[in-house]
Design a protein with these regions (language model features):
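N-terminal targeting leaders characterized by basic, low-complexity, disordered sequences
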Residues: 1-26
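Metalloprotease/metallohydrolase-associated module, dominated by Zn2+-dependent proteases
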Residues: 21, 28-94, 98, 146-293, ...
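Canonical hydrophobic alpha-helical transmembrane segment
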Residues: 97-108
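Short pre-active-site segment immediately N-terminal to the catalytic Zn-binding motif
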Residues: 108-125, 152, 156-160
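Active-site recognition of the HExxH zinc-binding catalytic motif
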Residues: 122-135
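M16/MPP (pitrilysin/insulinase) zinc-metallopeptidase core fold and M16-derived inactive scaffolds
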Residues: 140-145
């Protein structure tokens, strides 16, 4: 994903282009003098910090942001796994919610690794998420294009939220959750109906909803990891390590929200207690390490 500033008629535009395949050989062709000058100007404009949400693109600010976010990621991960373990001890793993969600995710993993990947569907969702958050930030989308090889949108606003939102917002999972919630307001989705499979003799639409959410979350997770390892340029634009910390923290918070909503024995209060306990342990460990280091140096 690359971010490029394009100046037209004294109005600044931002292009988010998404590459799924190998770079085109045209990129290696030597450009004319005027084109080279324009390319240099674009690189200069790209280095400017723009937008109210945009993190200043200096090494100092990126380092400070990373130092703040890294322990937050560790603490949130510890709290999530502690709550997940507590829910498993409370027999959450026996519930239909857990099994159908995991079944959907496992079936998606089989599709992702064994069959042809629906790249076009992912790219469309990726660019649509950029567009959605552009509108949320009171911006405008001037161009939207999607192909199997990649896609791009051109907007008049750019910030950290717009640039990284596709990596931590599972668009299709959110759409499915909203649809099932809306239908559930008028129809009882918990009613079980006879099914032709012996392993699941009776199914409800709620169970199928959990299955679909599991597949949609697996879709988001696998494609997010698949694209990140391809070294996306917009991660570099915001600082790769800093961007990865933002993505990891946001996804952990979404997983924690999902666990709290699905597991009846876990509440926000429980998650908060686990989070504060993990933070105290991390702080105590860091303080002890600093005291030990000071004694060794002194």
């Amino acid at each position: 994903m690359a971010t490029r500033n394009v100046q037209r008629k004294s109005k600044r535009r931002y292009e988010f282009s998404h590459q799924c395949g190998k770079p085109s050989r045209r990129e290696n062709v030597r450009l004319p003098g005027k084109a080279r000058r324009m390319k240099r100007e674009l690189h200069v404009m790209k280095a400017e910090a723009v937008g109210a949400w945009m993190i200043p693109m200096s090494a100092v600010w990126r380092s400070i942001g990373t130092l703040i976010l890294l322990p937050l990621c560790v603490v949130t991960a510890m709290a999530f796994f502690a709550c997940f373990g507590a829910s498993m001890e409370a027999s959450f793993w026996r519930s239909s919610t857990f099994w159908f969600f995991m079944l959907g995710m496992i079936m998606w993993l089989i599709v992702f690794f064994a069959l042809e990947r629906p790249v076009y569907l992912y790219v469309w969702g990726h660019e649509a998420t950029h567009a959605l958050f552009t509108y949320c930030c009171l911006g405008k989308v001037h161009e939207f294009r999607v192909t199997r090889e990649g896609g791009h949108i051109v907007t008049d606003k750019n910030n950290l939220l717009i640039a990284l939102s596709p990596y931590f917002v599972p668009l299709y999972a959110l759409v499915l959750a909203f649809v099932f919630w809306l239908v559930g307001e008028y129809v009882d989705l918990t009613v079980r109906h006879p099914a032709p499979w012996s392993i699941f003799p009776h199914l409800s639409w709620q169970m199928l909803g959990y299955w679909a959410l599991g597949a949609a979350w697996g879709f988001h997770f696998t494609f997010t990891v698949w694209m990140i390892v391809k070294d996306q340029p917009d991660l570099k634009a915001n600082g790769t390590i800093f961007s990865l910390n933002v993505i990891v923290l946001a996804n952990l918070l979404l997983l924690s929200l999902l666990l709290i909503q699905a597991a009846p024995t876990i509440s926000w209060h429980d998650f908060g207690d686990q989070w504060m306990g993990a933070a105290r342990r991390i702080l105590h460990t860091a303080t002890t390490a600093l005291i030990t280091l000071r004694k060794m140096l002194g």
